[in-house]
Curated annotation (Swiss-Prot):
InterPro entries: Mit_carrier (IPR002067), Mitochondrial_Carrier (IPR050567), Mitochondrial_sb/sol_carrier (IPR018108), Mt_carrier_dom_sf (IPR023395)
GO CC, alphabetical: mitochondrial inner membrane; mitochondrion
Chief localisation class: mitochondrion
Keyword terms of this UniProt record: Membrane, Mitochondrion, Mitochondrion inner membrane, Repeat, Transmembrane, Transmembrane helix, Transport
UniProt-recorded name of the protein: Solute carrier family 25 member 47-B
GO molecular function: transmembrane transporter activity
Solcar repeat ranges per the UniProt record: 1-83, 99-191, 199-286
Bilayer topology annotation: Multi-pass membrane protein
Signal peptide location: none
Annotated family: Belongs to the mitochondrial carrier (TC 2.A.29) family.
Amino acid sequence: MHLADFLAGSVGGAFGVAVGYPLDTVKVRLQTQTGYSGFWQCVRKTCRNEGLQGFYRGMSMPISTVSISSSLVFGTYRNILQFLHQLQHRSAGEPHHKAHIFLAGFTGGVTQVLVMAPADIVKVRLQCQTEPVQHISQESSSKYRGPVQCLLRIARDEGLLGLYKGSAALALRDGPSFATYFLTYNTICEILTTENQRPGWPVVLLAGGVSGMCGWAVGTPMDVIKSRLQVDGVSGRRYRGFLHCITHSVRTEGSGVLFRGLTVNCIRAFPVNMSVFAMYEAVVRLLR
């Protein structure tokens, strides 16, 4: 078992959250709320009404849990890939089959949903909870006062299954997204690296950034549905389930709604995943 990949994925994931969280908040608000006309208007309105802290709502929960989920993604990916490689009796020096990379990435993405779902719903609900900066105090009338209270409130009001609301969409987002993510990263590194050599740092940074953008291009439609299901019920219920959320959203807002936040996702994805893979490769090379 490749334990180094679990640790490296954990470090890389936590670092990536810290880099990309402000843009993630903007993305979630664009996907779930109708009061914003576009990216820059959302940024200006958030900054004006809530201050810089408005971009970091709910960050403590994902920064602590993404390290676990990212560890699962990278660790599962590497070990499944190695298993498939050995299953076909391929030698250690042979390049991995593209189908194996895709399948291993898909498995890694789906595996981390059990850990990711509760933290993600807390993150999304806190990000969507807007409050003027001058009113932020212990006497705040906000429904959720912080990550832990939000987690407990959801479990109390909606049951433990409420913490997994939108998890089907999350799995359908992360499976194909991580499959594309790892396949793109490996393909770029393979093209730009001399055979039997480790990719240089410029290649790692480029491949990491591009793979993140490609992964989000694939995952954004399910990301929109996931976010809408997660905030549904906070102030009235609109959707009866996963399929109804898709059909209702497309019917009332057009098919373009499924790509709402795509630009923000791609802008955020490049520096975030450049950082993730840089930290991942650094830790793996240190431990091996």
